[in-house]
């Protein structure tokens, strides 16, 4: 924008919110500790290798590194905090950086911050947190890219590998939910979405290539 121009006003159509919640950046870290802001149960981790919508380019691309974002709702990507009535935001005062800078009429501010200083789980959980080691082990035993490769083959050893990975992924979630007493909704932040849930998207992405 020219310095003399006023920023375009939001028409509050809600389209950006329906396309998915924002990824979080380092600047958003204080919001996770702000009363009325999002908490860990409101987040989902998209892991390296997952197909995800690049909101700047407008297309699905596999992630090179993980991102943490506000989760969707009702089985869709519509932001958890989007309120259809009035096209309002339930956490407007504590909305993340991408929401603050986005204008669908001029996306240059979003483009400048989009891939910069994105938060990861290790940034959000304090050093020494007891679950960090388990998260790392899950990432090693259940990598998205490795699971995607196993989906490409119907060989007996690959079917066994898929079953073992799916079992490990399910068991670690059950274990943490039972032993910790945490809200089960936090599991999608800690371990990303279940591999079983990712399988259709990974298969569809493979067919597009």
Enumerate the predicted regions with their spans.
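Hydrophobic scaffolds flanking metal-cofactor catalytic centers in soluble metalloenzymes
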Residues: 1-208
């Amino acid at each position: 924008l020219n310095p003399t121009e006023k920023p375009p006003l939001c028409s509050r159509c809600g389209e950006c919110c329906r396309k998915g919640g924002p990824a979080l950046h380092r600047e958003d870290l204080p919001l996770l500790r702000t009363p009325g802001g999002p908490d860990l149960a409101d987040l989902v981790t998209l892991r390296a290798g997952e197909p995800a919508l690049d909101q700047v380019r407008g297309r699905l691309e596999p992630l090179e590194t993980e991102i943490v974002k506000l989760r969707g709702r009702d089985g869709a990507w519509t932001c958890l905090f989007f309120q259809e009535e009035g096209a309002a935001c339930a956490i407007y005062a504590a909305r993340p950086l991408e929401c603050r800078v986005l204008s669908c009429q001029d996306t240059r501010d979003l483009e400048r911050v989009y891939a910069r200083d994105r938060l990861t789980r290790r940034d959000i959980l304090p050093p020494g947190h007891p679950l960090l080691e388990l998260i790392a082990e899950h990432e090693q035993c259940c990598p998205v890219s490795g699971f995607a490769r196993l989906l490409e083959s119907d060989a007996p050893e690959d079917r066994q590998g898929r079953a073992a990975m799916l079992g490990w992924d399910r068991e670690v979630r059950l274990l943490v939910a039972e032993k910790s007493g945490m809200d089960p909704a936090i599991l999608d932040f800690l371990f990303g979405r279940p591999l079983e849930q990712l399988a259709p998207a990974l298969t569809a992405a493979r067919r597009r290539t």
